[in-house]
Amino acid sequence: MNFKAITVCLLLVISVSGLSQTDQSINQTDKEGKKQGHWIKKYPNGNIMYDGYFVNDKPSGEFKRYYEEKPLKSVLVFSKDGTEAIATLYYPNGLVASTGKYVNQLKEGKWRFFSIMANDILISEAEYSKDKKNGLVAKYYQDGKAAEKLFYKNDLKHGECVKYYPDGTLTLRTNYINGNLNGKFEAFFENGRPEILGQYKDNLRDGPWLIYKKDGSLKFKTEYSAGVPDNSKIDIYQSDYLDSLERNKVRIADPEKTGEIW
């Protein structure tokens, strides 16, 4: 066998040995069955599902997950004990969807959500405690102006809620207690004049409700008691009109998320 043939054979042996060692160094468990070291899991189609490291069955350091069709889904940087992770989640188009922190796989602290249409356009911020909204939740228009500010307690609306037109003018101000409308309900035209003034009690209209025209003149007045108009002869149009006005007040949809990452 000449020198060239020997060299080729040695290279082949080294190459195969290297591949074998690489395969053997990933997806390993210890004698107790706990994941240790570098792990790569794949979808049935062969694409990578996740790529990361484990210490005693808990993720450690940088951990990447992918959508089935290859785009990056999330990057999580775990603490040494694997209980906390700084997360960046992505839309399938590659743009950042949200950033925040997980503690024991639950959202904790401030989370920021971004537009699926353009890079670095903040559309919402929310405070979380054990995966539940607690504190201020703010939503924004594409230009960064405030669209809505409201407070949550244990994942329920609780406290003042204000909404704005795109130019920053106040469009709605109301109040919630444990997820139910309670207290004043005030809606405004773009010119700042009141459109609806009323009161809620346990999610039901209560007391006098005043509906105004854009010029400031009164359109009609209706009295409610536990959600029912006191005047049995009330024009159905008035009640329907009031319902329609409330439905059509500015609403900002909850930001889309990239889905389950665990």
What are these regions (language model features)?
Residues 1-26:
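Bacterial Sec-dependent N-terminal signal peptides
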Residues 19-262:
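Glycine/tyrosine- and acidic-biased, solvent-exposed loop/turn segments at the edges of beta-strands
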